[in-house]
Amino acid sequence: MNELPFWKSKTLAEMTAAEWESLCDGCGLCCLNKIEEWDSGDVYFTSVSCKLLDGHSCRCSSYETRWDFVPDCVQLTRENVPEIAWLPPTCGYRLINEGRDLYWWHPLVSGDPETVHAAGISARGRTINETEIDIDDLEDYVVDWPLTVGEEKNEEEA
């Protein structure tokens, strides 16, 4: 029998906890500090990572207890994914919510957690940890690459 993978046959709301967690591709882009303009609501990514982001794996170093260290960490949920406009265009949660498929480099498709890095999608090698800068200088680190990663590869959806 040729069953479809869960991300092609279920909505976000129908996924198990394990399926939900596996949608994270490990890019680390959601763990970059962002600046929001109060008057316009525009959100800008920076190349400054959360203090808990492991710069090599692009995963949280204290995932289960992150709120003990970063109380304002945004937890992605079935309810808030549709409302979070700053999710990168390559984000698995965003793609599935929009009825799209995962890209070829997503670990669920490739079977390899390194493909997100090899494809140049992740934050690996592009960030500085927030503990290494003066947070008052955050605007000096504004970048647009989190919103454009993978553009030349976007036609290669599985």
Swiss-Prot record:
Belongs to the UPF0260 family. InterPro entries: Puta_zinc/iron-chelating_dom, UCP006173. The lineage of its organism: Bacteria, Pseudomonadati, Pseudomonadota, Alphaproteobacteria, Hyphomicrobiales. It comes from the Bacteria. It comes from Rhizobium etli (strain ATCC 51251 / DSM 11541 / JCM 21823 / NBRC 15573 / CFN 42). This is UPF0260 protein RHE_CH01262.
